């Protein structure tokens, strides 16, 4: 016992020193600005900080590639499908078409004897359509529905403590005794909905799969995640490959689709290699039920800065698994399609909410670095502090008073984006990933200020995005973007003022003209490809129905 505690203390000290040293090293490299290569007049330079970031991308891509090779080898491993699985679907003001597609895909799941529990967040007349769709798709004679005035933590109007207890027991009994059930309950947020499913199931099943009501599951999705959990008893949770269902509906949903592929098949695949996936996404994830019930109460009652948390449910669920020392994995063999916002403002609000949960969970996650591979500490430091270094770099370049610095920054952003997207195109075997380089502009212009706004408002709760049946536009997300554009515009004006005081040399004019032409050509080529290959092909494809969720 004493030896274990001593080793634990050593690991805590070691990971802390490693993380602090890494951060100090990156900061020193950034401040010193040592250059390996630089041209006359500093038109181009490549320094220590840039070399570090380039190395990170290469190493991350390498481990992602190795993890994908391991996934392919696992196909040869036979397993017995004798473990019990329950699928929990969280629904809130869902678009009827998406919900119907979700439930139809659930009926096609190939895992034998899977139990389906759908919990609707809200029990008003306006929510009844979701229960009707459930009965229609799952079969009125094969499913059970129940309208609950309460939820496990709040009583409905006219309910007593005794009647609340009785109704809670009734809900639990309904879930345990039926293979397919839909419950409408008093509104309480997504975490309340998930808690109802977990609590009612108890320890009656081996694995619990989670799913959102806008998700289309691949028939083999459950089987593939069970394989991962069966192969290693120290894996506590696993997530699958989440792709975009409505990627051709707008430019924002299309760019989100290529970003999703990169996030799952590069970033999370790399994390999976070391057994420390930091977020098992809500549309497609599976957990060991025995672990789930070790922390479900603490997970539900999570507080931050004195307020109960009502977002970041999936990320905190993942962190709870990691806190117990169990690994979390990703498998590209399990797939699904899910809805993403098609309007810029709704997308911005979604990203702000996700950023809030990321930074909040970063602090919680840091307490368990010592229980996992050093890669978990390394990546947390890199991804957690990168936005701050990036903002400092942008402001510095925009206020140096040189037009070339601004142009070089724009060119560098697209060059890095092209390099990453080219590798992704090779790994995926699909040229469409080249459009990932366009997402870098969206990141710099919108996601970066949204992250800062998320930190400033991190204790503000709420769903963040509205239900899909009725889209509510929230303009609050434009505030940080407007402030950011004002800062950048100020830098451009300052630079023009400084440059206007002295004539351009012939070499400087040549460099600026060539750089501008390259940047303009990049946009002309990419936008032309988007219009020709995506818009036209998309109109034909987005109306198709898929029996299998394929990488299309």
From Swiss-Prot:
Record-listed cross-link Glycyl lysine isopeptide (Lys-Gly) (interchain with G-Cter in ubiquitin), residues: 190
Cofactor needs: Mg(2+)
UniProt keyword annotations, A-Z: Cell membrane, Endoplasmic reticulum, Glycoprotein, Glycosyltransferase, Golgi apparatus, Isopeptide bond, Lysosome, Membrane, Phosphoprotein, Transferase, Transmembrane, Transmembrane helix, Ubl conjugation
Function description: Catalyzes the addition of GlcNAc or GlcUA monosaccharides to the nascent hyaluronan polymer. Therefore, it is essential to hyaluronan synthesis a major component of most extracellular matrices that has a structural role in tissues architectures and regulates cell adhesion, migration and differentiation. This is one of three isoenzymes responsible for cellular hyaluronan synthesis and it is particularly responsible for the synthesis of high molecular mass hyaluronan.
Gene3D superfamilies (UniProt xref): Spore Coat Polysaccharide Biosynthesis Protein SpsA, Chain A
Any one GO molecular-function label of the UniProt entry: identical protein binding
Domain of life: Eukaryota
CDD domains: GT2_HAS
Membrane-side (Extracellular) residue stretches: 33-45, 396-402, 451-475, 532-552
Pfam families in the record: Chitin_synth_2 (PF03142), Glycos_transf_2 (PF00535)
Organism field: Rattus norvegicus (Rat)
Topology in the lipid bilayer: Multi-pass membrane protein
UniProt modification remark: Phosphorylation at Thr-328 is essential for hyaluronan synthase activity.
Subunit structure as annotated in this protein's UniProt entry: Homodimer; dimerization promotes enzymatic activity. Forms heterodimer with HAS3. Forms heterodimer with HAS1.
EC class (word): transferase
Entry similarity comment: Belongs to the NodC/HAS family.
SUPFAM superfamilies: Nucleotide-diphospho-sugar transferases
Phosphothreonine modification, residue list: 110, 328
Entry keyword annotation includes Cell membrane: yes
InterPro entries from the UniProt entry: Glyco_trans_2-like, Nucleotide-diphossugar_trans
UniProt keyword annotation of Glycosyltransferase present: yes
Reaction(s) catalysed by this chain's protein: [hyaluronan](n) + UDP-N-acetyl-alpha-D-glucosamine = N-acetyl-beta-D-glucosaminyl-(1->4)-[hyaluronan](n) + UDP + H(+); N-acetyl-beta-D-glucosaminyl-(1->4)-[hyaluronan](n) + UDP-alpha-D-glucuronate = [hyaluronan](n+1) + UDP + H(+)
Principal subcellular localization: membrane
Glycosylation: residue positions: 221
Descriptive protein name: Hyaluronan synthase 2
Residue intervals on the Cytoplasmic side: 1-11, 67-374, 424-429, 497-510
Gene name per UniProt: Has2
């Amino acid at each position: 016992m004493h030896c274990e505690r001593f080793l634990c203390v050593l690991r805590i000290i070691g990971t802390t020193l490693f993380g602090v040293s890494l951060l100090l090293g990156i900061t020193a490299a950034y401040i010193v600005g040592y250059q390996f290569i630089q041209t006359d007049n500093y038109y181009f330079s490549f320094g220590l900080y840039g070399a570090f970031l380039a190395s990170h991308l290469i190493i991350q891509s390498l481990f992602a590639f190795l993890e994908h090779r391991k996934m392919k080898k696992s196909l040869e491993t036979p397993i017995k499908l004798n473990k019990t699985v329950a699928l929990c679907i969280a629904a809130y003001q869902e678009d009827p078409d998406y919900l119907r597609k979700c439930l139809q895909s659930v009926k096609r799941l190939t895992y034998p004897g899977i139990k389906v529990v759908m919990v609707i967040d809200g029990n008003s007349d306006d929510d009844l359509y979701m229960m009707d769709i459930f009965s229609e798709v799952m079969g009125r004679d094969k499913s059970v529905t129940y309208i609950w005035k309460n939820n496990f933590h709040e009583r409905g109007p006219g309910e007593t403590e005794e009647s609340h207890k009785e109704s809670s027991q009734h809900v639990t009994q309904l879930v345990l005794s039926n293979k397919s059930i839909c419950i409408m309950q008093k509104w309480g947020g997504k975490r309340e909905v998930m808690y109802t499913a977990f609590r009612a199931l108890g320890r009656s099943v081996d694995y619990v799969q989670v799913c959102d009501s806008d998700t289309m599951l691949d028939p083999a999705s459950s089987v593939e995640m069970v394989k991962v959990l069966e192969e290693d008893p120290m894996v506590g949770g696993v997530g699958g490959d989440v792709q975009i269902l409505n990627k051709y509906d707008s430019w924002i949903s299309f760019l989100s689709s290529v970003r999703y592929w990169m996030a799952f098949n590069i970033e999370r695949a790399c994390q999976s290699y070391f057994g420390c996936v930091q977020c098992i996404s809500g549309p497609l994830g599976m957990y060991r039920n025995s672990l789930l019930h070790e922390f479900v109460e603490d997970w539900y009652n999570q507080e931050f800065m004195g307020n109960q948390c009502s977002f970041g449910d999936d990320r905190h669920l993942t962190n709870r698994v990691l806190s117990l020392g169990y690994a979390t994995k990703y498998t590209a063999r399990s797939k699904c399609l899910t809805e993403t916002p098609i309007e810029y403002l709704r997308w911005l609000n979604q990203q702000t909410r996700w950023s809030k949960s990321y930074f909040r969970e970063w602090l919680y996650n840091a307490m368990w670095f010592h229980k996992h591979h050093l890669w978990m500490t390394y990546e947390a430091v890199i991804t957690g502090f990168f936005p701050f270094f990036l903002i400092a770099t942008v402001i510095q370049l925009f206020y140096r008073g040189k037009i070339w610095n601004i142009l070089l920054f724009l060119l560098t952003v697209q060059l890095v984006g092209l390099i990453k997207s080219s590798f992704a195109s090779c790994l995926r075997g699909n040229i469409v990933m080249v459009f990932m380089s366009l997402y870098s502009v969206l990141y710099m212009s919108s996601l970066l200020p949204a992250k800062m706004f998320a930190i400033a408002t991190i204790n503000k709760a709420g769903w963040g995005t509205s239900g899909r049946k009725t889209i509510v536009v929230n303009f609050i997300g434009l505030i940080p973007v407007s402030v950011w554009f004002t800062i950048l515009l100020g830098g451009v004006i300052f630079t023009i003022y400084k440059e206007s005081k002295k004539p351009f040399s012939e070499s400087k004019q040549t460099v600026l003209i060539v750089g501008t032409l390259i940047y303009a050509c990049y946009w002309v080529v990419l936008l032309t490809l988007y219009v020709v290959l995506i818009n036209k092909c998309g109109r034909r494809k987005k109306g198709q129905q898929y029996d299998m969720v394929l990488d299309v």
